[in-house]
Design a protein with these regions (language model features):
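PLD/PLD-like phosphodiesterase catalytic module centered on the HKD motif
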Residues: 1-218, 222, 337
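Long, largely alpha-helical accessory region at the distal end of helicase-like NTP-driven motors
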Residues: 196-219, 228, 429, 435-436, ...
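Walker A/P-loop
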Residues: 233-257
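Conserved strand-helix element at the start of the C-terminal RecA-like helicase core
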Residues: 265-274, 420-466
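Conserved helicase ATPase core of P-loop NTP-dependent helicases/translocases
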Residues: 294-295, 299-300, 319, 457-458, ...
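Post-DEXD/H (motif II) to motif III coupling segment of the RecA-like Helicase ATP-binding lobe
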Residues: 338-397
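Conserved interdomain linker/interface between the two RecA-like ATPase lobes of SF2 helicase motors
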Residues: 379-447
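Conserved segment of the helicase C-terminal RecA-like domain
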Residues: 528-533, 537-567
Length: 971
């Protein structure tokens, strides 16, 4: 009955009045694809497939890409024994027989094909434990419909006895019975018909397309061309283009040469095969308008308009001298991240073109050479992998992170023996996974990245002995041998075609193999840059190429945390962000691409995130220098946010203030504060302007800028900015925090407020006005303090405002954000920071206004038995929770918690998975106690059988826990 009541309220919210409070998960909802909101049809299907007891799908179209998008989930539910039926239409012979074959391979799914030309239904019905979920709308089982296209689907929660369930099941069964069972004989016949229609479609497309038509710039290229025009109008003669692999950098350079009307052009790169392909690209743009030539050691032509060469050839002094320094109007340096080498420097310093363009996917270098300075910090345009996916400049990829083999119970690590890397078990697993995940057209053309040359050679030999055609390429192979191998990989001649190329790192960059449809990674991830470079080898668009398959064998590697950094483009190096990305998966990635991990590999990534020190001085300095090089000046905290770089609070955590960190790196920085003002800056940077809350920071900003403001005016400013009311409690809170009475340190071995230790006067309240205090007023007279103080405020407010866009704000806390105990009690307006050990799992505030509850979900084995409470979620809304030891139902704190709702005492819940996550807890929402589920029980030491009384109770969250975080915490 409870479900029906909740459903009724949810229907009222969805259909009658949006302001009616009800269960969000039961409300009618439009399911669509919206990357900005992190919404995908795929995510909803993923979730419901894993929640249901049985499912029924009917779709007009199914493609291999659509099934691959759901593949990991379909495997999971097969293992769980969740049965399903899928009815597919033969409408227009669009459904892919390869997709049907994959679906038929699942023992738990019954698949039928209906041959009625007017069957165009798209419906998904899920039977849950006590209800049904129905999705009807526009989405077929294709990768674009599930992740990218503008779709319109209605999701309804239904009771078992509802009329809609009866009708939906009846209609499904009627058509399912009309459908035919799919035999191998039928599939073979249908494959012939499917191929016929597919080939007709390809032929029609070719007829409609003039292969010699002049190419036109894509959306990204148009923006970059506009910027390049603008730079030249400002008389700027050099610029850097940062563009992800396969997004059309070379064509862009040709378009810009055309729009600049350059007569003589030089294109320099480090390999001849790239130079030759660049020449072909320019020829497609200019056709017969210009002449083209390769400047080689054997034939150094200089009569052509456009000359293509390598850095090694041209840097020869004799070769350089054949050109006047002003011979070229326009020079292009491809793979510009290499421009710090002596050969490139010699070329760049010799010539004086009217315009110099550098192009790279990865300007970040580890050798301290400043690529940005070389181009005077003029960035013409920047598009990284995630943006390229959004703009559909590359093919979608389906990434599968799978567990590598175990040897004697342990996963392979960086020090694995050669015998284990190339053993029979691993070879068989690589082959099995390659066949299982396959590729878009069932004709594998794979590039396999290994960790050692010997491994690549041996694996190639073992693949060949099993009937595959493969080759191993290393640095010892000539460029001609590499080109021949690439031609064989792309060949349509089955006698000469290669299935696999095994390599180590020679294909990390610059190699263009558009037909690659599978990438296998057999090496630990040592660099997110190299990971993206290797992934990029298969992302270039090509005729009829639908997607790229990526198979990553994940072992017990220290740097597994770099995998989410690379895949999701998150360079904040926030452990919390990385965990959320791994958990959220597909909804966090643009377009039709998907990211899948098996459970063991996912745990290995979590372990790596937990154990990694992401804030070493070396890493901090590296990211600081990267941004400094990019900007051409010392970056401030706000610059890190605006450039999507490392979260700058990490510099504060390491050095007490950002100024302290900068001073430790910049030897010539003459910006020293006196000890008093430095201490004040450190306190504000660390304890107040840390991005966790906003009210005290906003007031601090206003006070420091205006010196005095009336409460009435401040109330108005706060409401206009945040739609939050500012009352007397807020004034008390602000004064307590900003005057540093809350924060405690030790003086003379006693816990003492910072205000009493340092005698800082920050803000005064008099005559209904807030006025700046003398300590802050005097400090702001010092320019260095002024700059770094206001920067920390700008960072804090911006960080908070970025977070609040994507989650609920609940009386001071952002749902699903992480907080330390210190920040939690501050936000809850405790007058003095408590001794956190004394608070333990919960603590009632002195004014009985709140009682924060802390749960470490997975307890450490070495803690005392009296702290090993078995707190656990019974579902996404219900928490089974235990009091402290030596408590009964009559204990004061227990009574206060039981009667919290009656007495308006808030029970905010803070949870972390385990102690490896550090000192921060997720805020999950506020709790309400179920007075009908209170039990006195015991907690017992299993060793000595000693017991202590405790109280067990059920509590309900104000909002069901978000699915991905729920899974992360409980698994």
């Amino acid at each position: 009955m409870e479900f029906e009541n909740n459903l009724l309220e949810s229907i009222k919210t969805g259909l009658i009045n949006k302001n009616i409070q009800s269960e969000i998960s039961l409300q009618p909802k439009i399911i669509t694809n919206n990357y900005a909101k992190k919404e995908k049809v795929l995510s909803t299907l993923d979730f419901l497939l894993q929640e249901c007891d049985e499912f029924f799908f009917n779709v007009a179209f199914v493609t291999k890409s659509g099934v691959i998008s759901l593949f990991n989930t379909l495997e999971k539910i097969e293992q769980l024994g969740i049965k399903g039926k899928i009815l597919v239409s033969k409408y227009q012979n669009f459904s892919d027989p390869s997709a049907l074959r994959i679906l038929l391979g699942f023992s738990n799914i019954e698949v039928r094909l209906i041959d009625e030309n007017n069957f165009h239904a798209k419906g998904y019905l899920f039977k849950l434990k006590n209800s049904y979920e129905l999705i009807v709308g526009s989405s077929n089982l294709t990768q674009d419909a599930l992740s990218k296209n503008t779709e319109y689907n209605l999701k309804l929660s239904l009771s078992n006895n509802s009329k809609l369930v009866e009708e939906a099941l009846s209609i499904f069964e009627r058509y399912f019975l009309k459908g035919v069972n799919i035999s191998e004989e039928f599939l073979n016949e249908y494959q012939i018909l499917f191929n016929k229609y597919k080939n007709l479609e390809i032929e029609l497309n070719l007829k409609n397309k003039n292969l010699f038509e002049k190419l036109s710039p894509n959306a990204m290229q148009e923006k970059a061309l506009k910027n390049l025009r603008f730079l030249r109008d400002l008389k700027i003669d050099k610029a850097l283009l940062i563009s992800a692999t396969a997004t059309g950098k070379t064509y862009l350079s040709a378009f810009d040469v055309k729009q600049s009307n350059a007569k003589r052009v030089l294109f320099v790169v480090h390999r001849w095969n790239i130079a030759k392909k660049a020449m072909d690209s320019f020829r497609r743009i200019f056709q017969n308008e210009r002449t083209y030539g390769l400047f080689e050691s054997s034939s150094k032509e200089i009569k052509d308009d456009f000359i293509f060469t390598t850095n090694l050839t041209l840097s020869n002094t004799e070769n350089l001298k054949r050109f006047d320094p002003k011979f070229f109007d326009y020079i292009i340096i491809d793979e510009t991240h290499r421009a710090g080498s002596a050969t490139y420097q010699k070329i760049i310093n010799y010539f004086s073109p009217k315009f110099l363009l550098g192009m790279t996917a990865t300007p970040e270098r580890t050798d301290d050479y400043d690529i940005f300075k070389l181009f005077e910090h003029n960035i013409a345009y920047e598009i990284r992998l995630q943006k390229a996916m959004e703009e559909e400049l590359i093919v979608p990829f389906h990434y599968f992170g799978i567990t590598d083999i175990s040897v004697n119970g342990s996963l392979l690590d960086e020090n694995a023996d050669f015998q284990n890397l190339t053993g029979e078990e691993r070879v068989e697993k690589i082959i099995a996974k390659s066949m299982k995940y396959g590729c878009d057209d069932n004709n594998i053309r794979a590039l396999v990245f290994c960790s050692r040359k010997e491994e690549a050679i041996e694996l190639s030999n073992k693949f060949n002995s099993r009937g595959f055609k493969s080759i191993a390429l290393t640095g010892k192979h000539t460029e001609l041998e590499r080109e021949e191998a690439i031609q064989r990989l792309e060949s349509n001649n089955l006698d000469e075609k290669l299935d696999y190329i095994f390599t180590v790192d020679i294909f990390n960059e610059g190699i263009d193999i558009p037909k690659i449809n599978q990438i296998i990674m057999l090496r630990p991830t040592q660099s997110n840059i190299i990971f993206i470079q290797q992934l990029g080898r298969g992302l270039r668009k090509f005729e009829n190429k639908e997607y790229l398959t990526v198979i990553d064998f994940i072992g017990n590697y220290q740097n597994n945390f770099l995998i989410p950094v690379a895949l999701f483009g998150d360079t904040s190096y926030s452990k919390d962000n990385l965990r959320k990305l791994v958990v959220s998966g597909n909804s966090e990635i643009p377009g039709a691409s998907t990211i899948n991990f098996d459970e063991i590999s996912k745990q290995k990534i979590f372990d790596s995130i937990s154990s990694a020190n992401l804030q070493t001085k070396r890493n901090l300095i590296n990211d600081y220098k990267l941004l400094k090089n990019r900007l051409g000046r010392i970056p401030m905290m706000i610059d890190f946010l605006e450039n999507n770089s490392r979260d700058p609070i990490q510099f504060v955590n390491y050095s007490n203030s950002y100024l302290d960190f900068v001073s430790s790196v910049e030897n010539d920085l003459d910006k020293i504060l006196d000890s008093t003002n430095l201490k004040l800056l450190q306190i504000f940077s660390r304890d107040i302007n840390n991005g966790c809350s906003f009210l005290e920071v906003f007031v601090l900003k206003v006070i420091s800028e205006e010196k005095i403001i009336s409460i009435e005016k401040l109330e108005k400013r706060i409401f206009e900015k945040y739609q939050i009311k500012f009352d007397n409690n807020s004034i008390e809170f602000i004064l307590n925090i900003l005057n540093l009475n809350y924060f405690i340190d030790r003086k003379d071995k006693k816990r003492t407020p910072l205000r009493s230790i340092y005698n800082f006067e920050i803000v005064n309240f008099e005559n209904n006005n807030l006025r700046i205090g003398s300590s802050l007023k005097n400090a702001l007279q010092e320019k260095v303090f002024f700059n770094y103080f206001h920067d920390s405020i700008a960072y804090s407010l911006s960080a908070f405002e970025n977070k609040i866009k994507n989650t609920d704000f609940v009386d001071g806390f952002l749902r699903y954000e992480k907080y330390t105990r210190r920040d939690i009690h501050k936000i809850l307006n405790w007058p003095i920071e408590p001794i956190h050990q004394n608070v333990g799992g919960y603590g009632v505030s002195d004014d009985k206004e709140n009682c924060p509850i802390y749960v470490t979900y997975k307890k450490s084995e070495d803690i005392a038995y009296t702290s090993k409470y078995e707190d656990k979620f019974l579902n996404k809304k219900t928490l089974e929770w235990f009091s402290k030891q030596k408590r009964t139902l009559q204990s004061n704190d227990v009574q206060e918690i039981i009667n919290s709702k009656d007495n308006n005492m808030r029970l905010p819940l803070f949870v972390k998975k385990d102690d490896d996550e550090g000192k921060e807890f997720y805020y999950l929402g506020d709790l309400e106690v179920d007075k009908n589920c209170l039990v006195e029980t015991f907690i017992t030491d299993k060793k000595n059988k000693k017991s202590e009384k405790i109280v067990k109770m059920k509590m309900y969250l104000d909002k069901p826990l978000e699915e991905n975080l729920y899974k992360y915490l409980i698994n």
